[in-house]
Amino acid sequence: MNQKIRIKLKSYDHNLVDKSSERIVRAVKATGAVVSGPIPLPTEKEIFTVLRSPHVNKKSRDQYQLCTYKRLVDIYSTSSKTVDALMKLELPSGVDVEIKV
């Protein structure tokens, strides 16, 4: 096949992203393909500021933060075994996977 497969992983939990990327790398290396990664991409941080009280005390606020962790895995010199290994791989439900061929 000799084409490049790019896999992007996203999750709110960095442990899930790291474990999922390691499982992908192990499965792909077992088929003999060349793997580049996992490459950590910048973390997106969303900060929400909310009033503590519904009526008064404008100065009293809470801040909440939502972090999105991302990893990138590139696979080169793929074969049909590599694609089959990726299809059979089961990842946790908290991980968003984007695959580009």
Swiss-Prot record:
Pfam family, one: Ribosomal_S10
Organism the protein comes from: Cytophaga hutchinsonii (strain ATCC 33406 / DSM 1761 / CIP 103989 / NBRC 15051 / NCIMB 9469 / D465)
Family: Belongs to the universal ribosomal protein uS10 family.
Signal peptide from the UniProt entry: none
The keyword Ribonucleoprotein is assigned to this record: yes
Subunit annotation: Part of the 30S ribosomal subunit.
InterPro entries, A to Z: Ribosomal_uS10, Ribosomal_uS10_CS, Ribosomal_uS10_dom, Ribosomal_uS10_dom_sf
GO cellular component: ribonucleoprotein complex; ribosome
Coiled coil: none
The organism's place on the tree of life at top rank: Bacteria
Gene Ontology MF: a single term: tRNA binding
Keyword presence, Ribosomal protein: yes
GO biological process, one term: translation
SUPFAM superfamilies: Ribosomal protein S10 (SSF54999)
Taxonomic lineage: Bacteria, Pseudomonadati, Bacteroidota, Cytophagia, Cytophagales
Keywords, alphabetical: Ribonucleoprotein, Ribosomal protein
Protein name (record): Small ribosomal subunit protein uS10
Gene name as annotated: rpsJ
PROSITE patterns membership: RIBOSOMAL_S10
Function field: Involved in the binding of tRNA to the ribosomes.
